[in-house]
């Protein structure tokens, strides 16, 4: 009996190691979003889940996130060299956006109100920020990005020169699992 218990424990430990946060081995094809791990990565007011991604799941063309922002919280002012699509699931907020241009800094952003069932896209390298303006309700969004893993350039404010923006790579949710091995195209 004790021998069987040891075998079962060994199998469970091996399976747990195989299905670690940084491995696609052992992950089921169909998963329940509410059972996926959520983290704030040291950013107060944020809850982030990578539903399907480059670093965690081996995706090459797109990455999908579920993000929840507490009332008053926001993303940093930032840009990245990928396209981004948002679907607002609940809550309300403001999208601040400056189109990429040949100016030396982002400048004054345009404001767009976002609300449940609204969707918007961020073109490549457009500086933007999403802000939860709701007083009592979380802002929850489903986000799809192209060309993962994301390389983010962060700004202190809208007048900071593009050349002074700080690169954050790997991004917070990719830090633990990112490996410096090069990604190879299928060709």
Swiss-Prot record:
Its main location: endoplasmic reticulum. One of its GO terms (molecular function) is auxin binding. Zn(2+) binds at residues 78, 80, 84, 128. The lineage of its organism: Eukaryota, Viridiplantae, Streptophyta, Embryophyta, Tracheophyta. The keyword Metal-binding applies. Transmembrane segments: none annotated. Homodimer. Disulfide bonds join 22-177. This is probably a receptor for the plant hormone auxin. It comes from Nicotiana tabacum (Common tobacco). One of its GO terms (cellular component) is endoplasmic reticulum lumen. One of its GO terms (biological process) is cytokinesis by cell plate formation. The gene is T85. Residues 1-20 form the signal peptide. The keyword Signal applies. A motif (Prevents secretion from ER) lies at residues 184-187. CDD domains: cupin_ABP1. This is Auxin-binding protein T85. It comes from the Eukaryota. Gene3D superfamilies: Jelly Rolls (2.60.120.10). It is found in: Endoplasmic reticulum lumen. Keywords: Auxin signaling pathway, Disulfide bond, Endoplasmic reticulum, Glycoprotein, Metal-binding, Receptor, Signal, Zinc. InterPro entries: Auxin-bd, RmlC-like_jellyroll, RmlC_Cupin_sf. Glycans are attached at residue 117.
């Amino acid at each position: 009996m004790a021998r069987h218990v040891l075998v079962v424990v060994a199998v469970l430990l091996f399976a747990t190691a195989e299905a670690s946060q940084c491995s696609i081995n052992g992950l089921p094809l169909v998963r329940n979003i509410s059972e996926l791990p959520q983290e704030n990565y040291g950013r107060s007011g944020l809850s982030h889940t990578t539903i399907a991604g480059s670093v965690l799941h081996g995706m090459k063309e797109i990455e999908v996130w579920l993000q929840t922002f507490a009332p008053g919280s926001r993303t940093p002012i930032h840009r990245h060299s990928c396209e981004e699509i948002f679907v607002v699931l609940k809550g309300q907020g403001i999208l601040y956006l400056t189109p990429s241009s040949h100016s030396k800094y982002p400048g004054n952003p345009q404001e767009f109100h976002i609300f449940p069932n609204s969707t918007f896209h961020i073109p490549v390298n457009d500086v933007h920020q999403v802000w939860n303006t709701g007083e009592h309700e979380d802002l929850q969004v489903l986000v799809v990005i192209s060309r993962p893993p994301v390389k983010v350039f962060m700004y202190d404010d809208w007048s900071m020169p593009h050349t002074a923006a700080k690169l954050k790579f790997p991004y917070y949710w990719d830090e633990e699992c990112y490996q410096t091995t090069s990604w190879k195209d299928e060709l």
